[in-house]
Amino acid sequence: MFTMKKSLLLLFFLGTINLSLCEQERNAEEERRDDDEMDVEVEKRFLSTALKVAANVVPTLFCKITKKC
């Protein structure tokens, strides 16, 4: 029974170390990848915001210019 507990503890310890190393590697990979993805996300957010503002402003400007409201 004692040997079984020892081996289970050893397996648990090695598994924990393995998961920790995998997590560190995954985080490092995400950091490298995040820089490019963040730029794309910022561009997407900027374009959608610009389109929303344009959709609200253009009809108002058109109305004021043509005076057909």
UniProtKB/Swiss-Prot annotation:
Q: Which residues form the propeptide?
A: 23-43
Quote the cellular component terms of the Gene Ontology held in the record.
extracellular region
Please indicate if the UniProt record lists Secreted as a keyword: yes
* Tissue specificity annotation: Expressed by the skin glands.
Keyword Transcription in annotation: no
Keywords, A to Z, come to: Amphibian defense peptide, Antibiotic, Antimicrobial, Cleavage on pair of basic residues, Cytolysis, Disulfide bond, Fungicide, Hemolysis, Secreted, Signal
Q: Which GO terms describe its biological process?
A: defense response to bacterium; defense response to fungus; killing of cells of another organism
Stretch forming the signal peptide? 1-22
Q: List the disulfide bonds.
A: C63-C69
InterPro entries (UniProt xref) = Antimicrobial_frog_1 (IPR012520), Frog_antimicrobial_propeptide (IPR004275)
Q: Where in the cell is it found?
A: Secreted
Any Pfam family from its record, for instance, is Antimicrobial_1
Which protein family is named in the record? Answer: Belongs to the frog skin active peptide (FSAP) family. Brevinin subfamily.
What does this gene product do?
Antimicrobial peptide. Active against Gram-positive bacteria R.rhodochrous X15 and B.licheniformis X39 and against Gram-negative bacterium E.coli ATCC 25922. Has antifungal activity against a slime mold isolate. Has weak hemolytic activity against human erythrocytes.
This chain belongs to the protein called Brevinin-1CG1
> What's the source species for this entry?
Amolops chunganensis
Q: What is the lineage of its organism?
A: Eukaryota, Metazoa, Chordata, Craniata, Vertebrata
